[in-house]
Amino acid sequence: MICAPFVGVNHHWKNVLFGCAFLLDKITVSFTWLFETFLESMRNQKPNAVFTDQCQAMKNAIRVVFPDICHRLCLWHISKNAAENLPRHYGIPKFKSRFNKILFNCETESEFESSWDALLRDYNLVGNKWLSTLYENRERWCLVFSQQFLYKNESFIKE
């Protein structure tokens, strides 16, 4: 059973639980039902952005129910998924440090690109399927590719 909390941030930068549901499976139909039900409970007021893990079924449902909102990937989930998808490498402190620098601290696109390329090259990960998919979705999680969104919605800048 999957627990699906809906958490927001109030004007004091505190987490607020809007609702929670339990799903039997992780399929697009279930997530579509969940998001439509949530939207109805919020009087059809859509969120400005949605932060999720890398679940493809959830991504598909967001496209259907919230086609115009900003869908971002949660950095905490990416870090957790890295530990699961790259267990041999993520256990190496220097690799973990470099990977987390890419996730949280790159300030320019060129710094991101050079750091990413060096990490893949240095640890022989060129062609790794999980990292390739993560790179293809970099606009959804890498802050240097999200600046336009962040400046439009300053409420998402504060940590």
List the predicted regions and their residue ranges:
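Conserved catalytic motifs of the protein kinase core domain
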Residues: 1-2, 47
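Short conserved beta-strand segments at catalytic cores or DNA/RNA-binding microdomains
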Residues: 2-14, 23
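Secondary-structure transition/capping motifs at alpha-helix termini
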Residues: 9-14, 38-46, 65-70
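Short Cys/His-based metal-binding microdomains
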Residues: 13-17, 77
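Generic secondary-structure boundary/loop-capping signal
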Residues: 19-20, 153
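Active-site beta-loop-alpha junctions of metal-dependent nucleic acid enzymes
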Residues: 20-42
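Extended amphipathic alpha-helical interaction segments
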Residues: 44, 51-54, 59-159
